[in-house]
Amino acid sequence: MARKPGQDFRSAQSGLSELKSRLFFVIGALLVFRAGSFVPIPGIDAAVLAELFEQQKGTIVEMFNMFSGGALERASILALGIMPYISASIVVQLLTVVHPALAELKKEGEAGRRKISQYTRYGTLVLATFQAIGIATGLPNMVNNLVVIDQTMFTLIATVSLVTGTMFLMWLGEQITERGIGNGISILIFAGIVAGLPKAIGQTIEQARQGELHVLLLLLIAVLAFAVIYFVVFMERGQRRIVVNYAKRQQGRKVFAAQSTHLPLKINMAGVIPAIFASSIILFPGTLAQWFGQNGESSTFGWLTDVSLALSPGQPLYVMLYAAAIIFFCFFYTALVFNPRETADNLKKSGAFVPGIRPGEQTAKYIDKVMTRLTLAGALYITFICLIPEFMMVAWNVRFYFGGTSLLIVVVVIMDFMAQVQTHLMSHQYESVLKKANLKGYGR
């Protein structure tokens, strides 16, 4: 059978067309996300709200506001952002380890994954509702004249608006994952972080222009930033490869020769979750002090002010607890997402083995030993990245828009996005090659 002229070209064009449509979908979804972050909750005085957020520097509120792309400081319907979904996902992952029914559900393949995703949505709804009620009832008590309508009506409207906004973002993230490129939730967080980058760069340049920030110091910070980004990319791509062999075996009339492959284990298996949770916990007392401890010693919660001062960025106690929290969550979350015993059992069932290690229990212990060392290295790496901005702020008295957590998220999401694009292009190249081979075989 003769091959039609231009068939390869049309196949390549089809692959590029699909990639373009996915990219345009991601861009469109991000535009909707950014537009939604400017839709305010009815009944709030914007000027009073702006003054309130000036007092929230260095608290958990500032971090969540950055993740939401500034939606929180504008009291947008998307102010809660996607954090309730992340929290619900981690809770459900923890339950799949400790709850037998969910553990079995996890093993049921695609059907089990869909069921777990549904439970995550329910958890997101519950967490978003509690957080929305907290914000709706807490905001009017933080400052006078913030709410310009009846407080009961505002509580109802704000709660419904915030919960709806979070559920919409969850749906939008799932649509990006399915119809776009990359992990939709990560891309939304990435978009929220980089949305404030132009403003931060403009403020930094203005400080340098007015002499508040020396030009040489600015150049040094830029060089260090590029060096840290390079280091993050290097560490995120790093992995330990455990050699795995498959013995010669026979299935029916087919004989499969002995094969050798490897089991890749990432240095940073936990990703950015430990940094996010550690920041949330360390900054939480300061946030409570801002909300409840503003009346000093006469307040019931006045002691929170002393705690928040001890845990303010740059303080020795803050640095030690922050580092300890990151290391703890690295080991904790890695234990949730990776099970050495399950991996060893899967290798044994498939007829694979690690050279020099007995299949089963001994293999599980060996993988656990390797993973523990990798997790320690990954935890120290994340701690180093997250503490660099803290040390620089103390040494040079310069405030950074990008903390270590934000930098990790941005770099990891970009790397994942580029890998997804490359995988998509490669899959279409393989598809084109296979079609060509099939047509040649058919034409003989």
From Swiss-Prot:
GO terms for molecular function: protein transmembrane transporter activity; signal sequence binding. GO terms for biological process: protein transport by the Sec complex; SRP-dependent cotranslational protein targeting to membrane, translocation. The keyword Protein transport applies. It is found in: Cell inner membrane. SUPFAM superfamilies: Preprotein translocase SecY subunit. It comes from the Bacteria. One of its GO terms (cellular component) is cell envelope Sec protein transport complex. It is a multi-pass membrane protein. The chain crosses the membrane at residues 24-44, 77-97, 123-143, 153-173, 181-201, 215-235, 269-289, 318-338, 376-396, 400-420. InterPro entries: SecY, SecY/SEC61-alpha, SecY_CS, SecY_dom_sf. Keywords: Cell inner membrane, Cell membrane, Membrane, Protein transport, Translocation, Transmembrane, Transmembrane helix, Transport. It holds the Pfam family SecY. Belongs to the SecY/SEC61-alpha family. The central subunit of the protein translocation channel SecYEG. Consists of two halves formed by TMs 1-5 and 6-10. These two domains form a lateral gate at the front which open onto the bilayer between TMs 2 and 7, and are clamped together by SecE at the back. The channel is closed by both a pore ring composed of hydrophobic SecY resides and a short helix (helix 2A) on the extracellular side of the membrane which forms a plug. The plug probably moves laterally to allow the channel to open. The ring and the pore may move independently. Component of the Sec protein translocase complex. Heterotrimer consisting of SecY, SecE and SecG subunits. The heterotrimers can form oligomers, although 1 heterotrimer is thought to be able to translocate proteins. Interacts with the ribosome. Interacts with SecDF, and other proteins may be involved. Interacts with SecA. This is Protein translocase subunit SecY.
